[in-house]
Amino acid sequence: FDAEFGVWLAAHPGLPCLLAGMVGSRQGWAEAPYAACPAGLADIARQLLWLQPGRLAIVPGLSCESDGVPDVLRGEETQVFGALQALQSPGMAGGPHTLVLPGTHSKWVQTDGGQMRGFRTHMTGETYALLRQQSILARMLPAEDGDLDADAFDAGVAQAQRPGGLLHHLFSVRTLALFDRAGGAALASRL
């Protein structure tokens, strides 16, 4: 830690430093226990893991029960509370709101009254990367992601809403290429 932040801390004496994200995970610098939903900013503040009291703390992640199993997030709570602050404008205050945080593990967060009520994690980016790089579909796709083909993306979303199931719809990326009905960037966008 000192190798990374020692100079910064020395240059800013007395300024508190909050660390968020995987730094508080089991694989991080120190494990900060999860705070349970529902949770507001004050709940998070009460559960800070102080490494140097009053100076340096790790922000806890959050946990909730989602469909009968535990779900967790670390770091995204800082984005959510920032968004909740922005939503305090007239006509937007309170809630409820659903905030979507796209990424490797996308989060759909339910908020109400300035609190995070619960959330669901989806392995969107990670699944895309695995399919894109290590499945039979990889050979059909361009080596690098290019610009989004919005029409192909919309077609993929529309197909996902039809009967047949996710795995069948994923295989259709291959068959569309085999029958020259789509190729390249369109396939990647559809996927």
Model-derived segments and spans:
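Glycine-rich phosphate-binding loop plus the immediately following alpha-helix
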Residues: 63-93, 97-98, 102-163
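Short, well-ordered amphipathic alpha-helical segments that serve as non-catalytic structural scaffolds
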Residues: 1-9
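Generic structural "secondary-structure junction" signal
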Residues: 25, 31, 36, 118-121, ...
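Residue-level marker of positions within ordered structural domains that often coincide
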Residues: 6, 24, 88, 136, ...
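Short, intrinsically disordered, charge-balanced linker/junction segments flanking boundaries
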Residues: 3, 37-41, 46-51, 178-190
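Short beta-strand-loop/turn "lid" adjacent to the catalytic site in phosphate-handling enzymes
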Residues: 8-73, 113
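Adenine-nucleotide phosphate-binding core of ATP-dependent small-molecule kinases
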Residues: 159-190
